[in-house]
């Protein structure tokens, strides 16, 4: 790749139909974990006009009122009137949950957490870069900020004409592999009938874009596409069917890193799609925070029923202060990559997952997000002798 280029990432709001589905799946997981930390949960959700379908495999001693919980999440997300796309108070809720296969359980459940086998085969990636304060790629970082500000102004009533469904996209111009300025911002937001397109355009730029995008990244040539198709009244599940796990690039690094293909929401941490990806981020972030590289990508892979990974790979894209093979060795010595130890060390059996389902699983330094800690950075730096 040339050192001078444009790079684009997108984010979506919590009211986007796919994100509504993710929230429902993770809310169900959280409620189960409150009662049963040993539960096995794989919960998928589909939302469409007037209905929500919950399906998957759950094995647990917990009891939760799934219908009530689904309705609660839909209303809390802002869908409390059918003219917004769905009304959580009146929509149909269909429950098609079954139990986890006993064939899978016999390979995964081994008694002690330390011996826990991976819930499936798969490959996961973690990534970090020193482009932003949270060590996330710039385009996804700013896309998430735009969507969080849209939600903030909608909920506070500051921009009372906003509705829940929205998307943002940011294109960064890179020079010598470093982000220099924003070339293009795209933001589409659902709204009610009371706002004109001109007033909406001006308000989005003044009250959303300028509140979160640093002025030094905006130039006279920065292009804005605000609701570029015009009116956006029909949104949410009425406009598009929503499905769990369909925004995996929004959930991770905005396309700036590889993705193993597995979604996160609705899965308990015995599923390495989730826990392995969280561990990958934890490793990559600590490597960059330690100053061992400007950019780091980690791949781990697992076999179903096997506790240890079948492979580990570290790539610093030529930015490493020591060789990638040396960093890989330090990672192996510093981090325990057995599935059960990942769950234990990152404390993943807590009901924290609905918070992850919006605005990215990575790059938000919340107390619950243990994979965002940089508590291993000093150890890595000391061991690397740099």
Curated annotation (Swiss-Prot):
Binds 2 divalent ions per subunit. L-methionine binds at residues 57, 100, 240, 271. Its cofactor is Mg(2+); K(+). GO terms for cellular component: cytoplasm. PROSITE patterns: ADOMET_SYNTHASE_1, ADOMET_SYNTHASE_2. Its main location: cytoplasm. Gene3D superfamilies: 3.30.300.10. ATP binds at residues 16, 165-167, 240, 246-247, 263, 267. Keywords: ATP-binding, Cytoplasm, Magnesium, Metal-binding, Nucleotide-binding, One-carbon metabolism, Potassium, Transferase. One of its GO terms (biological process) is one-carbon metabolic process. It is found in: Cytoplasm. Residues 100-110 are annotated as: Flexible loop. Mg(2+) binds at residue 18. The keyword Metal-binding applies. K(+) binds at residue 44. Pathway: Amino-acid biosynthesis; S-adenosyl-L-methionine biosynthesis; S-adenosyl-L-methionine from L-methionine: step 1/1. GO terms for molecular function: ATP binding; magnesium ion binding; methionine adenosyltransferase activity. Its EC number is 2.5.1.6. InterPro entries: ADOMET_SYNTHASE_CS (IPR022631), S-AdoMet_synt_C (IPR022630), S-AdoMet_synt_central (IPR022629), S-AdoMet_synt_N (IPR022628), S-AdoMet_synthetase (IPR002133), S-AdoMet_synthetase_sfam (IPR022636). It catalyses: L-methionine + ATP + H2O = S-adenosyl-L-methionine + phosphate + diphosphate. Pfam families: S-AdoMet_synt_C, S-AdoMet_synt_M, S-AdoMet_synt_N. Homotetramer; dimer of dimers. Belongs to the AdoMet synthase family. Catalyzes the formation of S-adenosylmethionine (AdoMet) from methionine and ATP. The overall synthetic reaction is composed of two sequential steps, AdoMet formation and the subsequent tripolyphosphate hydrolysis which occurs prior to release of AdoMet from the enzyme. HAMAP family: S_AdoMet_synth1 (MF_00086). This is S-adenosylmethionine synthase. It comes from Francisella philomiragia subsp. philomiragia (strain ATCC 25017 / CCUG 19701 / FSC 153 / O#319-036).
């Amino acid at each position: 790749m040339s050192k001078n280029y444009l790079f684009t990432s997108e984010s979506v709001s919590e009211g986007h139909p796919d994100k509504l589905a993710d929230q429902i799946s993770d809310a169900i997981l959280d409620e189960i974990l409150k009662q049963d930390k040993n539960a096995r949960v794989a919960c998928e959700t589909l939302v469409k006009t007037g209905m929500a379908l919950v399906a998957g495999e759950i094995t647990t001693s917990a009891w939760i009122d799934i219908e009530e919980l689904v309705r609660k999440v839909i209303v809390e997300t802002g869908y409390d009137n059918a003219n917004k796309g769905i009304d959580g108070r009146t929509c149909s809720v269909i429950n098609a949950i079954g139990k986890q296969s006993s064939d899978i359980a016999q390979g995964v459940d081994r008694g002690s957490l330390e011996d826990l086998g991976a819930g499936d085969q798969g490959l996961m990636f973690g990534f970090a870069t020193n482009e932003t304060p949270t060590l996330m790629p710039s385009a996804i970082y700013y896309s998430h900020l735009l969507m969080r500000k849209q939600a903030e102004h909608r909920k506070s009533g500051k921009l009372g004409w906003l509705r829940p469904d929205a998307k943002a996209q940011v294109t960064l111009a890179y020079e010598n592999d470093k982000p220099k300025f924003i070339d293009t911002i795209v933001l589409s937001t659902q709204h009610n009938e009371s706002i004109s397109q001109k007033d909406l355009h001006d308000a989005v730029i003044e009250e959303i874009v300028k509140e979160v995008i640093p002025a030094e990244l905006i130039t006279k040539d920065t292009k804005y596409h605000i609701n570029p198709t015009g009116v956006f009244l029909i949104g949410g599940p009425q406009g598009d069917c929503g499905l769990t796990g369909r925004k995996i690039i929004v959930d991770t690094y905005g396309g700036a890193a590889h993705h193993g293909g597995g979604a996160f929401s609705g899965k308990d941490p015995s599923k390495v799609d989730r826990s392995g990806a969280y561990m990958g981020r934890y490793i990559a972030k600590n490597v960059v925070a330690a100053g061992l590289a400007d950019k780091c990508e980690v791949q781990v892979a697992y076999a179903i029923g096997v506790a240890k990974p079948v492979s580990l790979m570290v790539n610093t894209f030529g930015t490493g202060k020591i060789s990638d093979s040396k960093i890989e060795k330090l990672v192996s010595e510093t981090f325990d990559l057995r599935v059960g130890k990942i769950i234990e060390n990152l404390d993943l059996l807590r009901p924290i997952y609905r918070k992850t389902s919006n605005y990215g699983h990575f790059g938000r330094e919340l107390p619950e997000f243990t994979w965002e800690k940089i508590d291993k950075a000093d150890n890595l730096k000391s061991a690397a002798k740099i």
